[in-house]
Regions:
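Charge-rich, low-aromatic oligomerization/scaffolding segments with amphipathic character
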Residues: 58-77
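Short acidic amphipathic segments
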Residues: 12-15, 22, 30-51, 55-57, ...
């Protein structure tokens, strides 16, 4: 999924997703997916702005690659 980094400090990144609007269901799917990434400690998804804040420990690169791999089509909530 395409995104841009809005703000970043060590161990925390806030990203904005390129989409017109985000439904609550999409926000829930994104939150669920981000929480499953290794090294993620906390996730906050803002559906009104299509942003997500991720607190993590470990590799920044792994987190950003994980975010990039996300797709609403491939994720399902059970």
């Amino acid at each position: 999924m395409k995104f841009v980094i809005r703000h970043e400090i060590r161990g925390r990144v806030r990203v904005h997703f390129y989409q017109k609007d985000m439904s609550i269901r999409q926000a829930d799917l994104l939150h669920y997916y981000l929480c499953t990434l290794p090294g993620v400690k906390n996730v906050r998804v803002y559906e009104r702005t299509a942003d997500a804040a991720v607190v993590y420990e470990g590799s920044r690169r792994c987190i950003l690659e994980g975010i990039q791999r996300f797709s609403y089509d491939s994720e399902r909530m059970e």
